[in-house]
Amino acid sequence: MATVVGFDFGLKRFGAAVGQSVSMTASPLKEIPAQDGIPRWEAIEALLEEWKPALVIVGEPLNMDGSVSEMALRARKFARRLHGRYNLRVEMADERLTSSEAKSMVRERYGQRDFGRFAVDSIAAVFIVESWLEAHADNLDAFLHPPRKQGKSNDIID
């Protein structure tokens, strides 16, 4: 069993979720405040220390046509910083429509539009993690436990 942590990148806050490879499910975590896309690193560090993930997944907000958006570039920069600061394997995952899906779920389930009360960004992070786990179900073990090459890093940032 391996633990995976996922982030929904944002300018004001980051959604966070933790997933398990055995259950192929994820649960929302407390959102992390950010200022202009820069997270409170001490909150990120505490989360990573608590969950000790084998892999971190960062949502990549591509444009609807699949082209790279300015936000996607910023999310990639965040992923590189995660890798550099904590020496973790980081994967990017297409997050198109996850925030819309999370808001729809809150509206349907609770009849609410006060999305701040429901940690919508962390719900989006759940969708990011679960989608990634599902997409890699056939070779999950290889992603989560790659053989180490002597003297080389296998850490991946797409």
Swiss-Prot record:
Q: What is its main location?
A: cytoplasm
Which biological process annotations from GO are given for this protein?
A: rRNA 5'-end processing
Report keywords, A-Z.
Answer: Cytoplasm, Hydrolase, Nuclease, Ribosome biogenesis
Q: Tell me a Gene Ontology molecular-function term this record carries.
A: nuclease activity
Function of the molecule: Could be a nuclease involved in processing of the 5'-end of pre-16S rRNA.
Tell me the disulfide pairings in this chain.
none
Q: Which GO terms describe its cellular component?
A: cytosol
Which family is this protein grouped under? Belongs to the YqgF nuclease family.
Alphabetical list of SUPFAM superfamilies matching this protein: Ribonuclease H-like
State its Enzyme Commission number(s).
Answer: 3.1.-.-
Give the subcellular location: Cytoplasm
Q: What is this protein identified as?
A: Putative pre-16S rRNA nuclease
